[in-house]
Amino acid sequence: EMPLAVSLDGEWAFHYAENLTAPFSDWDTLTVPGFIQMQSLQKPGQPYGAPHYVNTQYPWDGHEKLHPGQIPQDYNPIGEYQRSFTLPESWASCYLRLNGADSAAAVWCNGVYIGYTEDTFTPAEFDMTAAVHPGENTLTVQVYRFSSGSWLEDQDFWRMSGLFRSVELFTKPEIHLEDVVVKQDFAPDFSSATVTFDCKVSGAGTISVVFDGEEQSAEVGEPAEYDSGVVFGKGEADPDVEEDVQDVSFTFTVEHPTLWSAEQPNLYETEIALLREGALVERTGLKVGLRRF
């Protein structure tokens, strides 16, 4: 396991306010990951509220008259989390990942505003490189119980808030796999399959993909060094100069593929490796099922 990430799970300093203009409570501690209200139930007087169940209604119905997109003003609790962390000496960059913040969150590092997210169940990432410094740093996350995104989360479930999934710091090495999309196509009689890996890579070096025992690789460099569509080995690199990310595609042919099904969930092992001057920098493993739906 490569030391590219540091978990921030555990005890965080925490205080609470009922809305943006209300005073915050005294500092307490809460556990991350975890819902604020579930931990409030374990404290005398339930100081941070309780879980709220609604099905076909919004939580603010009957309390405040709101139009879609507006958020409650009188009762919209804020939970502010804070903790310190030490930046690893070898890191040249520092990113924060909130894997789940219900329903919205704003982030500060060392008093510098970093960003905002509102999408409860989608991880959010923030670049904190410009705000961190060697040694101890202070991270603050404000979590809002309701946001404009809450209008889209009108499902039949318990309403709670907080950092309910893991929080972590991570760095990106000199060459990094930003994303990968797997596409597949089949012969009409399913006698063969074509599997394409569309990779987004930042930085310069070598990317290698091993699928079904076959290896393909491509050299990627700084985007300005190449023209779009240059082919290296068997991989095709298509630079994206604006985002400093290159698109690299690898295509494999599988004869007589073993298909995936619910009854027989066959999977093909895949490994994507990134190297810099011949040294392994990053490795990602995938399991790919072949199936046409």
Where are these regions (language model features)?
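Short glycine/proline/serine/threonine-rich loop/turn segments at secondary-structure transition edges
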Residues: 92, 132-136, 254-267
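Beta-strand-rich binding/interaction modules
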Residues: 107-109, 192-235, 248
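Accessory beta-strand-rich segments of carbohydrate-active enzymes
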Residues: 15-17, 43, 51, 71-178, ...
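Short strand-edge motifs at loop-to-beta-strand transitions and within beta-strands
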Residues: 81-83, 122-126, 224-226, 246-252
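N-terminal carbohydrate-binding accessory modules
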Residues: 271-293
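Surface beta-strand/loop "capping" patches
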Residues: 174-203
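Accessory carbohydrate-binding/adhesion or oligomerization-edge regions at the termini
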Residues: 1-60, 138-142, 146
